[in-house]
């Protein structure tokens, strides 16, 4: 049993310990109590452990919201100060380290102070307390040989993390983290990992390329994975082929079934008005579906053609490409926990000099007219004039084009490249990669191993395997393990460190103001300039939530005032949690930060222009402040700046440094129509604890409906309503396709 309840040794009350999450909290009572085990099924909401106590009060030593329901689950009220008449209630208390519910028959008074939340009953009552682990860390580690058939047995246990087999498992809080995998000579299963039987079986050939794409299905359907000649999913009395194109069909089935579960769950514990239920073209008996066992319900799902509902489905969050190699098996529990779609490419595409694509385009030599805008680039332009400056002064590399002689290198603060001049009025943030030409010369390291993953329709894209992925998050096992060790975000203690080792950037003004970081009021921001190698090592070893680095990087490392610090060769233990290395070709140094202790970061693959790098830095800073994770933040920045394609995420792309006040991350869009009203939409991105399956509600527009995160659109709203929405929180807002921020929209006549 993962949750243990014991009487307090001194005070009156109980201690609740979650051995999986390694958390503990106290519930105080008004008299000594002896918790007696009770049936978890006595609770309306799902719990894993339940006890009864005799008490006149329940007190939690923290501020919380108390939600009261009838015994049948109907909402009565919620808040922190109210009174209920005598009746039988199911009451939830949030937030506490576990899900906490109590069932009581009494009159109830809820009060709060600045330190505690108290429920007082009209008399001493029998109170049933139920608890459910949030279970965001695995119950244990399965030791397994890494041959395909042994791996099938391990993946078959991923469903043991599910808190329920009902449609409510589409809620992120009812899906625990699958057990970890560890290569071993023999197959071993830890004590707390129990096999879950759903009656679903997935049959695939015993090959990594066939096993990896069905991992999220095995987890979500609690399915047994067995070897067979043709890929299919089987239940009692039905069978559904996953051929041809296993990856596509597995992804479609997950999206379809998950969406139908989100609608079906409105017949269960949370009978809300769901927009997707009201607008679906499907005419199904949702109550009947809810009552079915999982395997029988899935049999109904597979009878519905994906094409029939494809247009109704929200854009899925993540696709992960996992190379079909045994060494990548340890990543599978993390991929399943994110409910990522999975592809397993046997071959990889490499960028070529003649390939006409954005990825290849920004890796080529620049057009001569724009080369000087890239720090270290050499310009052949001769358009010097009144607005001209030395070439090479506009980017963040510390070197010229590849192959430049060592004698051509300059100290910090001096221009690099030629002394020819360029026009500073030239457009440098929207260089069309398809208009550049040339061969690979000055942009990528000699030993770079770039790969071009196939495009995906999901918001985010990750890559597991060798190579530097263009346009995808380079995910690593060590970074994902650090996710498990990361504590919950404390809004009041978020540290941001800005390091500026770029003399020219310092001359432009205060770096914090330049990057707009001062409007991140809940952040403790420190700016450091011109660090030596020793000072940089000390900085990187410090306990910092987010490092924003501005300066020079080349093949020798990060430039400091007394030389270069190459993180690939240092023994420093990095304490920085997340980072943006806003310098030219910072990929290898960013990867070294991950290897030495960081969780995730954003890096560059090429030389980057100062102006566009500054703009991107401002965007990323504000998005991280707004609770976006690294992958989604870069996705939004790339929408605004084509040069955002020069950046990728390394490590755990799901890293956040604070929680969004709205739960999910939000991007607004608005355009004025012919009647001077506004068409408005909000795109919600699942994020952190508010993962895939979360519900959202646009209360600012007085909507009673809940939504599955996706794009929510409203039409013909007055400007005053847009202002009201924008005033709630600082978030990105695209006006006619151009990025502004909600605070700017309110203060200016946009």
Predicted stretch roles:
Residues 1-122:
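Long, charged/polar, low-complexity intrinsically disordered N-terminal extensions
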Residues 203-207, 499-503, 528-531, 550-552, ...:
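Structural motif
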Residues 226-244, 248, 314, 324, ...:
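Long, hydrophobic alpha/beta structural blocks
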Residues 327-546:
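A domain-level signal for caspase-like cysteine endopeptidase catalytic cores
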Residues 472-473, 545-632:
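Catalytic cores of nucleophile-dependent amide-cleaving enzymes
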Residues 234-280:
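Long, continuous compositionally biased terminal/linker segments
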Residues 564-565, 625-750:
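Caspase-like cysteine protease fold
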Residues 7-12, 113-203, 209-212:
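Acidic, contiguous N-terminal accessory segments
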């Amino acid at each position: 049993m993962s949750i243990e309840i014991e009487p307090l040794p001194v005070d009156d009350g109980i201690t609740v310990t979650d051995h999986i999450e390694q958390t503990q909290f106290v519930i105080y009572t008004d008299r000594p109590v002896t918790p007696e085990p009770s049936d978890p099924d006595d609770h309306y909401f799902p719990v894993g452990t339940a006890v009864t106590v005799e008490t006149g009060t329940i007190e939690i030593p923290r501020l919380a919201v108390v939600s009261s329901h009838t015994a049948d689950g109907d909402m009565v009220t919620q808040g922190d100060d109210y009174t209920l008449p005598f009746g039988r209630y199911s009451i939830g208390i949030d937030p506490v380290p576990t899900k906490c519910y109590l069932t009581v028959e009494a009159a109830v008074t809820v009060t709060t102070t600045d330190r505690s939340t108290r429920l007082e009953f009209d008399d001493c009552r029998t109170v049933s307390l139920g608890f459910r682990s949030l279970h965001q860390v695995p119950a244990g580690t399965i030791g397994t040989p890494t041959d395909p058939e042994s791996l099938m047995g391990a993946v078959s246990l991923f469903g043991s993390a599910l808190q329920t087999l009902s449609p409510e498992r589409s809620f992120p809080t009812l899906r625990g983290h699958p057990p970890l995998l560890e290569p071993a000579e023999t197959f071993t299963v830890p004590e707390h990992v129990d096999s879950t039987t759903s009656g679903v079986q997935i049959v695939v050939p015993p090959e990594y390329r066939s096993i990896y794409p069905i991992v999220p299905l095995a987890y979500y359907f609690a399915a047994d994975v067995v070897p067979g000649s043709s890929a299919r999913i089987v239940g009692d009395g039905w069978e559904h082929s996953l051929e041809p194109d296993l990856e596509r069909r597995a992804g479609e089935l997950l999206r379809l079934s998950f969406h139908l579960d989100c609608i079906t769950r409105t017949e269960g514990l949370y009978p809300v008005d769901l927009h997707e239920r009201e607008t679906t073209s499907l005419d199904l008996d949702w109550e009947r579906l809810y009552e079915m066992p999982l395997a029988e319900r899935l049999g109904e799902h597979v009878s519905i053609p994906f094409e029939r509902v494809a247009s109704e489905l929200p854009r899925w969050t993540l696709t992960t490409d996992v190379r079909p190699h045994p060494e990548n098996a340890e990543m599978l529990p993390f991929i399943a926990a994110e409910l990522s779609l999975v592809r397993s490419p046997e071959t990889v595409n490499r960028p070529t000099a003649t390939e006409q694509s954005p990825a290849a385009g920004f890796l080529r030599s620049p057009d001569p007219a724009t080369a000087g805008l890239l720090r270290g680039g050499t310009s052949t332009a001769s358009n010097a004039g009144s607005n001209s400056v030395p070439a090479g002064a506009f980017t963040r590399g510390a070197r010229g084009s590849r192959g430049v002689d060592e004698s051509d290198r300059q100290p910090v603060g001096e221009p690099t490249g030629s002394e020819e001049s360029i026009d500073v009025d030239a457009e440098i943030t929207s260089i069309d990669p398809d208009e550049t030409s040339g061969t690979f010369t000055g942009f990528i390291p000699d030993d770079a191993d770039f790969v071009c993953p196939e495009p995906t329709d999901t918001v985010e894209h990750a890559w597991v395997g060798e190579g530097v992925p263009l346009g995808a998050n380079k995910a690593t096992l060590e970074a994902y393990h650090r996710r498990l060790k990361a504590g919950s975000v404390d809004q009041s203690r978020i540290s941001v460190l800005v390091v500026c080792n770029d003399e020219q950037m310092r001359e432009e003004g205060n770096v914090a103001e330049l990057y707009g970081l001062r409007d991140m009021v809940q952040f403790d921001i420190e700016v450091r300039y011109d660090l030596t190698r020793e000072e940089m090592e000390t900085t990187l070893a410090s306990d910092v939530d987010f490092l924003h680095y501005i300066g020079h990087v080349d093949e020798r490392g990060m430039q400091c005032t007394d030389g270069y610090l190459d993180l690939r060769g240092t023994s420093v233990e990095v304490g920085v949690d997340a980072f943006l290395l806003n310098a030219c070709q910072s990929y290898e140094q960013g990867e070294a930060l991950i290897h030495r202790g960081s969780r995730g970061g954003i890096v560059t693959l090429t030389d980057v222009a100062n102006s566009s790098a500054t703009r991107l830095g401002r965007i990323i800073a504000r998005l991280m402040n707004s609770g976006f994770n690294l992958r989604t933040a870069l996705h939004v920045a790339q929408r605004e700046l084509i040069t955002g394609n020069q950046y990728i995420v390394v490590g755990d792309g799901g890293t956040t440094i604070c929680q969004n006040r709205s739960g999910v991350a939000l991007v607004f869009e608005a355009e004025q129509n012919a009647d001077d009203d506004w068409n408005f939409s909000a795109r919600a991105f699942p994020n952190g604890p508010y993962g895939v399956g979360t519900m959202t509600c646009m209360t600012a527009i007085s909507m009673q409906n809940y939504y599955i995160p996706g794009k929510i659109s409203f039409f013909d709203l007055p400007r005053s309503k847009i202002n009201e929405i924008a005033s709630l929180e600082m978030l990105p807002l695209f006006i006619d396709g151009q990025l502004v921020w909600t605070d700017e929209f309110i203060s200016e006549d946009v």
